[in-house]
């Protein structure tokens, strides 16, 4: 019988956020797989957890992933932890979880600390709908292309960012997304936690005057304007064309007018096709 893979979240800055259940599971499993064993051993020692520890990270995930799967298939129970927060979110834990599912291995995800949701809730921006993007690319051109794809995203957007790229990322956001509201979360739950709720331009000015330290979660307001209408509707019927324009924020009257002008049709020809809209 196969063992079970436990996904165990760890504190993102404050050790008091470690749950009783996580401590119990870590004490019960046969093996703990950690992103950085040097970092995790300190956490385990603090909670007096003395279980075998092995590394599982981006640079060894292929070979170590196979090793862990074989251990699980042999009946061992394994706990997966990351340096901070929920494994599988912007880290290689995603891969071992997929492999476990492919091998029909039971997986149990324990609830706990997650930087993205913690930052979102305290942002003051819309929380009903959001998009998690994680880290943007290091390359400036690729990063801007990624932001271009999100330019008209109406949901609140969550990003992770490192201190040495923060200023460049904020400048790219201002250029591509425009000067919208943002909540910049630094060192969440730690001693020097800071949340700046301003517009992007103001935040850039703030960090131009201070040293950038710590890890950041950026919560960016979703797009509030009218979406850009693409001119690639040749294959649509007049009715489909009108519906598409309306879905992009145009009212019915203007949509009909646009279709008539684009297709050189009389108004009544198009109007008859959309009477029920």
Language-model regions, residue ranges each:
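Glycine-centered tight-turn and secondary-structure capping sites
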Residues: 92-94, 252
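Loop/turn-to-beta-strand initiation segments
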Residues: 3-5, 75-79, 155-156
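Short active-site oxyanion
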Residues: 26-32, 104-108, 156-157
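Conserved helicase motor
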Residues: 56-62, 136-139
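Short glycine-rich anion-binding loops that position phosphate/pyrophosphate groups of nucleotides
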Residues: 12-15, 83-87, 163-165, 223-225
